[in-house]
Amino acid sequence: QVTEAGASDKAGTFVKFKPDASIFITTEYKYSILATRMRELAFLNKGITIILTDRRHLNEDGSYQTEIFHSEEGLKEFVKFIDSNREPLVDNIIYINTEKNDIPVEVAIMYNTSFNENVYSYVNNINTIEGGTHLTGFRRGLTRTLKSYAEKTGLLSKLKFDINGDDFREGLTAVISVKVQEPQFEGQTKTKLGNNEVVSAVDQAVSTMLEYYLEENPKDAKSIVNKVILAATARHAARKARELVQRKTVLTGGGLPGKLADCSEKDPAQCEIFFVEGDSAGGTAKQGRDRRFQAVMPLRGKILNVEKALVHKVFD
């Protein structure tokens, strides 16, 4: 029963929770985990103030350990906090705050000079560590918009190989927050969003705002696209090196001598191999061959003409 206690300028609710030892294995709270969660909530709900106080232990001065979490810029400050130890690629933060298909969508994007992708996604303030449809929509909108801009401006004209979605997300830090009335959670730990309608909502929100940002900030856009090209080039070079090692492993594993000068063509039907007598002839043949499809292998000793030789000579 609620009774009137008198006039007050304060309002709110106290919620007390004590873990049941018969259900929970551990009943002692870890301050660091609670602090991380309170900080997240302050970033996700800009303007609110959260005070965390640990009254289990007293400090030397007789006070309790206390932290105050407050953010005026929300997700913008969140990505700055995540990237605090990284060098930014561009100074501006790409910020999106809109509503698509009755779904509020808020996204903050920042590129840095590292090679890692750091994307955090939330639904109704719940950390969806397994991702879900909102993350799918974000990646789709980001990749399509950046690729379209790069092709339209001719920045990809000299690239001789394709780029993929991973290249666009190298050095990317982003926070995605959506509000869904009836969220459907999937996955083993129920931390993956399954609402299909969220894909198009986030996709549209990201592509619309990102397209506008790229047009208004051509210098930043060029830096981001150049970062993408660098990532694609590194990935392509790594794949080539890996294939070369695998190819050499196959050849050496098959018992072929190390003196074989292989060709670069992978299709056996398009390749030729020349067996030459001795290292001297092998060196001359290597200089005159087309290394794209012609391989040369020097043989030790004199080659026997089996058509004219006696049978016992052939098998000697």
Where are these regions (language model features)?
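GHKL-family ATPase ATP-binding module
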Residues: 1-315
